Regions:
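Small-residue helix-packing and pore-constriction motifs in hydrophobic alpha-helices
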Residues: 1, 7-59, 70-78, 85-99, ...
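N-terminal glycine-rich anion-binding loops that anchor highly charged ligand groups
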Residues: 61-64
Length: 144
């Protein structure tokens, strides 16, 4: 019986490791979403919508839900409201994916630039497309 236990030890360790990683991933996501809530003031239904959108983006893009939440944090710091974040996150994520840049950094760049140009969150998708084209055509990257 002792031999059987020794044979299962690597399997048990692997399963425990997966469980630990899943708990950490969930905790990271919750931590990021708490920051979004604190900065944006989103509660109740607004917060639930943001949380669902971050999870959706994590499921359908190369980025995780935690990374999407981190991008929303920068949007919240820029004063974006819930509807702005819900509508703007896809354009920012597409730009980050196309450019290979970090998602949170890309969100920071887009929100800062929109503010500097006096544009609104509604312009984020178009603005992200322009940045992607400019960086591609100018042999540079989005952060330069």
């Amino acid at each position: 019986m002792e031999n059987v236990g020794k044979k299962f030890l690597p399997v048990t360790a692997a399963v425990t490791g997966l469980g630990t990683a899943a708990v950490k991933t969930a905790a990271d996501f919750d931590s990021e979403m708490s920051k979004v809530s604190a900065i944006s003031g989103a509660t109740g239904d607004d917060f639930d919508q943001l949380r669902a959108k971050a999870r959706e983006m994590g499921a359908k893009t190369k980025f995780s839900a935690s990374e999407a939440a981190s991008a929303m944090e920068y949007m919240a710091m820029a004063g974006w409201k819930t509807s702005d974040m819900l509508n703007g996150i896809e354009g920012v994520m597409n730009l980050a994916a196309a450019s290979g840049e970090d998602l949170a950094t890309t969100s920071d760049i887009v929100t800062d630039a929109l503010t500097a140009f006096g544009l609104s969150a509604a312009d984020s998708g178009h603005f992200a497309d322009i940045l992607a084209a400019a960086s591609s055509n100018a042999n540079t990257n989005v952060s330069m």
